[in-house]
């Protein structure tokens, strides 16, 4: 796909040879069959409160989605008056590794790509160039298919540990990863609400990584 070549070359940054290598890897994955083809299709990420969430907070997240804003990933509630750029990306083999990373466009024009990564200090999910991403955890990202709906939910390091933390901006919650399974102990400002999340992979209809 032309977008992938231009965006990666402009933002990761990579040499022309590296960009062509990544495209080749994506083509190889597609050739492996339909079981893997979905990974290279652009998608949105819908955010949903887990079943363990109190009903009053769960309702807040109806129709919410993951967005990118000022180098960070957030959950934007449907009630938000300001609409930010939605996560619009796909899985991509992370350079010089044996695992998949995640990339997303950061704007509509130009449609540049950034890597998605975990800030190891704050445990907030961020986006940036490869040099920025490598200061944090770049993967492995994956997905699990959940029956009976057959929806795919995003994993990081093999599990669903995503948490939304209320921010000081109306309708916007920070996206965090509870890496140590301790409810983000010591990292949540006093008085801020938190919600355990499921991130649902939603294919963009009609899109495929083909030029």
Where are these regions (language model features)?
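Acidic, polar low-complexity intrinsically disordered regions
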Residues: 32-141
